[in-house]
UniProtKB/Swiss-Prot annotation:
Disulfide bonds: 310-359
LRR repeat residue numbers: 53-74, 77-98, 101-122, 125-146, 150-171, 174-195, 198-219
The protein, known as: Leucine-rich repeat and fibronectin type-III domain-containing protein 2
Key word Secreted present: no
Residue intervals on the Cytoplasmic side: 556-788
SMART domains recorded: IG, IGc2, LRR_TYP, LRRCT
Name of the gene this protein is made from: Lrfn2
Amino acid sequence: METLLGGLLAFGMAFAVVDACPKYCVCQNLSESLGTLCPSKGLLFVPPDIDRRTVELRLGGNFIIHIGRQDFANMTGLVDLTLSRNTISHIQPFSFLDLESLRSLHLDSNRLPSLGEDTLRGLVNLQHLIVNNNQLGGIADDAFEDFLLTLEDLDLSYNNLHGLPWDSVRRMVNLHQLSLDHNLLDHIAEGTFADLQKLARLDLTSNRLQKLPPDPIFARSQASLLTATPFAPPLSFSFGGNPLHCNCELLWLRRLERDDDLETCGSPGSLKGRYFWHIREEEFVCEPPLITQHTHKLLVLEGQAATLKCKAIGDPSPLIHWVAPDDRLVGNSSRTAVYDNGTLDILITTSQDSGPFTCIAANAAGEATATVEVSIVQLPHLSNSTSRMAPPKSRLSDITGSSKTSRGGGGSGAGEPPKSTPERAVLVSDVTTTSALVKWSVSKSAPRVKMYQLQYNCSDDEVLIYRMIPASNKAFVVNNLVSGTGYDLCVLAMWDDTATTLTATNIVGCAQFFTKADYPQCQSMHSQILGGTMILVIGGIIVATLLVFIVILMVRYKVCNHDTPGKMAAATVSNVYSQTNGSQPPPLGGIPVGQLPQAPPKVVVRNELMDFSTSLARACDSSSSSSLGSGEAAGLGRGPWRLPPPAPRPKPSLDRLMGAFASLDLKSQRKEELLDSRTPAGRGAGTSSRGHHSDREPLLGPPATRARSLLPLPLEGKAKRSHSFDMGDFAAAAAAVPGGYSPPRRVSNIWTKRSLSVNGMLLPFEESDLVGARGTFGSSEWVMESTV
């Protein structure tokens, strides 16, 4: 019976095991171990029905994306876990916490971006960790903390690693293989491989390493090494594909005996591209450091930050250190910070920082130094209110003692608070929107003041502003204030205390004041409006002045050239037609002989009309008549026409000047006529001399006359003009008289008008007619004639 029950129980257990195998998986029950094989089954996640007693689990070649904490829970007996060739991008922390028996973990060919601190937590017996061909960009410092002493094989190749937790690698004392090839490593910490005595394979191929730290482990990679022990096996070392900087720092590596590697140099330029093992040792050289730039002197106010700069060059790049004035090596602390580029920042300066700071630049070839002189301006420290009440040992109260004494007899009493006394020693005046004048006074018995310090801050801001003032000044103008704001201001005195060898300070006094309000927008608008108004006013004044000036000129012109009504009524003029313009004279029928036509006389010159005043003609006639004898004047007075009384003498003008010249010419001609009339021979000669005028000779007189010398005449090559008399209708009337025309006996008496013409001729008139016509031509006009 017992045998039957045992058989049934064994059959049930076997059936249960077979039934627990996941779908699409193969479960093998080999003696005491159970293996679950699910490779390349298209799984999207870890099957939840996996037997928790599984020893070997293979899930490679699937499409698993995420690993959770429940996927491998309670699999304490799992020894080998393969998750290769999936698309795993995230592993939840503590997902492998129950895999305490796991020896081998394969996570290669996935998409893991990083390994966190708790990603591999719980793998206390892990020996093989394969994480190659991922996208690892960083590994946490404690990611390998649980299996540092048990790990034998670590493969991190074909990732994007810029660095490793080298401290953790240093403690992997049982490590046999370390694959770090095809990454972005550019630095290996010195002493990383010092304790890896069991390391048999080290692959650093295809990284960005420029140098390797010297380590005794690399001596086991020499080809001549024949002795090997299980505790110190030969080292297979590969570091090809790195841009090695072949200088004196790699001279130790060059001295190793290797004959089968093809490493090349990446720098310097003289060795670039050459095989590392073919370069002579003499060519591995370095350059000593040279400081190219540094701070020389620095003046800093106590309590403020200070920056000291020091730059150096060399091969290899030198390291820069700073030494304080007390020969102390300056490092990173809460008050100082040293950067890789050689800059030293002192965040808060003290009096102990005053002195020379030394910059030391050192490399494998030597060192260089430079000194930076730092001067700290010590600030006086404000004492509390309780210390002001009792006089200190340095007699600080003497500064304000005078103010107390001066007001001691004022009846204020001894009960007045002592703190109110120093406040009255400071006076603020001349307060504007952005400035204020501060004045203070101290007693003569006070110690010798070294310097004054002015402290003030805005009532809306807690920032305290300091101003250092020489001891010789007792007033100071505070500028750059904010308008419409209250300020608290205190004046402190500082001097050297001989007892403590420190700077002693005390408050001289305090005051409060408000700056005036400012309205910049309104003020600017007012100035703009005022400026525009001034421009308009000035422009209006200029325009009005110009208008008045123009009106005055017009009125003056009209007054000077206006003819009076009496003269216009008395004057009779006649139309004169040029002898060469082709016009016909008007008919003379009905006009009696000796009667003047009622037409204004004109002289035509180049089609330009120019009227001369009547006074000019009268002045010419009066000057001509005055040269005659008294008998002739009496004869003219008895004529049928009487001349009106002479007009007032006109103002000097061009017309008057020309008339004067004409009068002088006529006067000379009249004298010659008088001489000719007295002698018969002379009369005939005079008649003949004036009766033949050519077209080229002016009628005003011979070429040598004074009028001709003043009036410019055309030359031979130009149109010829002559000066002639134009008597208007007198010529026509004389022509109508039977008997033809006779030359005038006295030409000067009929010079009432002048005409410029090409063919001038002398018109015949009797002397009696001219005397009567003189009253008619009271006003004359000049007409310019066009010539053909």
